């Protein structure tokens, strides 16, 4: 889907991703330029930002208490190379970016932000499961049918 929109990673981020010799991406780290780019503030909603859907905001307001927030991380793994990990947390680290909307907060570390910037966090409630999901990720080339794993554009 995202490939059809012609969106891609920046050159700095592309250089920072190192594929495993067999071609599967297992992990990545960002260089100084890519880290600055991932953590820089931008007024445009799509550039370096994470958008929250109304259903995400509503669900977070229901389940969080006090200083709790939703943490979004990207880890190596899953059937497509990378996977999204959601958890409730109360500690904001120095390299974290906080995205707040309507009193609900989603926090993303700078390494993970490079893989999800411009994406949207949603809460989906279906007959068989309810979950937070990352939608419309411009950094993802393809994802698996479960929606929790993806590969990045190189």
Curated annotation (Swiss-Prot):
The record's PROSITE patterns line, in alphabetical order, gives: HESB
InterPro entries recorded for this chain? Answer: FeS_biogenesis (IPR000361), FeS_cluster_insertion (IPR016092), FeS_cluster_insertion_CS (IPR017870), HesB-like_dom_sf (IPR035903)
Biological-process GO terms, alphabetical: iron-sulfur cluster assembly
Signal peptide start and end residues: none
Instruction: Give the source lineage, highest ranks first.
Output: Eukaryota, Metazoa, Chordata, Craniata, Vertebrata
Q: Which cysteines are joined by disulfide bonds?
A: none
| Residues that coordinate or bind Fe cation | 79, 144, 146
Q: Name one GO cellular component term.
A: mitochondrial [4Fe-4S] assembly complex
| Subunit-level organization | Heterotetramer; forms a dimer of dimers with IBA57. Interacts with [2Fe-2S]-ISCA2 forming the heterodimer [2Fe- 2S]-ISCA2-IBA57 complex; [2Fe-2S] cluster binding is absolutely required to promote the complex formation.
Q: Which GO terms describe its molecular function?
A: 2 iron, 2 sulfur cluster binding; 4 iron, 4 sulfur cluster binding; identical protein binding; iron ion binding
Mind telling me which NCBIfam families this protein's record contains? Answer: iron-sulfur cluster assembly accessory protein
Q: Which family does it belong to?
A: Belongs to the HesB/IscA family.
Q: What is this protein's name? A: Iron-sulfur cluster assembly 2 homolog, mitochondrial
Task: Using the UniProt entry, state which stretch of residues is the transit peptide.
Answer: 1-8
Enumerate the UniProt keywords alphabetically: Iron, Iron-sulfur, Metal-binding, Mitochondrion, Transit peptide
Which Pfam family, giving just one, matches this sequence? Fe-S_biosyn
Subcellular location per UniProt equals: Mitochondrion
- Role description: Involved in the maturation of mitochondrial 4Fe-4S proteins functioning late in the iron-sulfur cluster assembly pathway. May be involved in the binding of an intermediate of Fe/S cluster assembly.
């Amino acid at each position: 889907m995202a490939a059809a929109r012609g969106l891609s990673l920046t050159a700095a981020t592309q250089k920072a991703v190192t594929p495993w010799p067999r071609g599967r991406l297992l992990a990545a780290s960002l260089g100084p330029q890519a880290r600055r780019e991932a953590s820089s503030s931008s007024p445009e909603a799509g550039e370096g930002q994470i958008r929250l859907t109304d259903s995400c905001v509503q669900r977070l307001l229901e389940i969080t208490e006090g200083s709790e927030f939703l943490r979004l991380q990207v880890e190596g793994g899953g059937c497509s190379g990378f996977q999204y990990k959601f958890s409730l947390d109360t500690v904001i680290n120095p390299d974290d970016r906080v995205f707040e909307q309507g009193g609900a907060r989603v926090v993303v570390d700078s390494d993970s932000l490079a893989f999800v910037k411009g994406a949207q966090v949603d809460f989906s409630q279906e007959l068989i499961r309810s979950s937070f999901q990352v939608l419309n990720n411009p950094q993802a080339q393809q994802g698996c049918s479960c929606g929790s794993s993806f590969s990045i554009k190189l």
